[in-house]
């Protein structure tokens, strides 16, 4: 696998592939990779001739009191895992490469509406940071296809909306959430959990599953939500949000809506965990 922190190197290699009529898939990451990321790379390899990955801990998407400095950097292990999964080109830029004028002077991309709810309400500016860095990476790599995990459901919709609104010729593919045997969604932030917290953490998925089952049985949105919040608190969580939304727009779900998604974010110990369930009733 070729690794470079320089934009020109990435563009030169991609152009060489393009000159031969070959296709390119892209998987952007922040590193500290787990099996969910590796699944994205393997899926990417099945879609296109070549796979490009990136590792960049993006300061623009972290808030003032979030874990930017504490976010694990594990480049050697990540590189080995990416190579084994089929990535051929790895972009590892520094903040100075991506934001040479600094964050305050950086042109940014903002997707209105869908960026302002749920995680966007809890983490102001987060999705502006996500949209900006993903747009920059898309312009550098210029892939045919880009893959993202469904675990970050709101992020996936933000990126799909950005691509559609800006007429970017890139197919965005969401890949199913990869889970531990307990049902806990794999996340780089699971490493913050103590043994006791990790044992309790599957309650997040269990609460979401119970909400969906209740809705399908005719229970009200309010009833299933309050029951799920109580279960989370009993398990040691502090809920941030637990909401039922329209699966395509993330607007508040109405009783007549068929395409639904339950989205949750909750704190346990030092970790803020997110999960979701997309379903039709």
UniProtKB/Swiss-Prot annotation:
GO biological process, one term: pantothenate biosynthetic process
Pathway per the UniProt entry: Cofactor biosynthesis; (R)-pantothenate biosynthesis; (R)-pantothenate from (R)-pantoate and beta-alanine: step 1/1
Family: Belongs to the pantothenate synthetase family.
Main location: cytoplasm
PANTHER family hit by this protein: CYTIDYLATE KINASE/PANTOATE-BETA-ALANINE LIGASE (PTHR21299), PANTOATE--BETA-ALANINE LIGASE (PTHR21299:SF1)
Entry binding sites for beta-alanine: 61
Positions annotated to bind (R)-pantoate: 61, 155
InterPro entries for the chain: Cyt_trans-like, Pantoate_ligase, Pantoate_ligase_C, Rossmann-like_a/b/a_fold
Organism phylogeny: Bacteria, Pseudomonadati, Pseudomonadota, Gammaproteobacteria, Alteromonadales
Key words of the record: ATP-binding, Cytoplasm, Ligase, Nucleotide-binding, Pantothenate biosynthesis
Name this polypeptide is given: Pantothenate synthetase
Locations listed in the record: Cytoplasm
Further comment found in the protein's record: The reaction proceeds by a bi uni uni bi ping pong mechanism.
UniProt-recorded Gene Ontology molecular function terms: ATP binding; pantoate-beta-alanine ligase activity
Organism of this sequence: Shewanella baltica (strain OS223)
Gene Ontology CC annotations of this record: cytosol
Quaternary structure and interacting proteins, as annotated: Homodimer.
Catalytic reactions of this protein: (R)-pantoate + beta-alanine + ATP = (R)-pantothenate + AMP + diphosphate + H(+)
Broad EC category: ligase
Protein residues bound to ATP: 30-37, 149-152, 178, 186-189
Superkingdom, taxonomy of origin: Bacteria
Role summary: Catalyzes the condensation of pantoate with beta-alanine in an ATP-dependent reaction via a pantoyl-adenylate intermediate.
Enzyme Commission identifier(s): 6.3.2.1
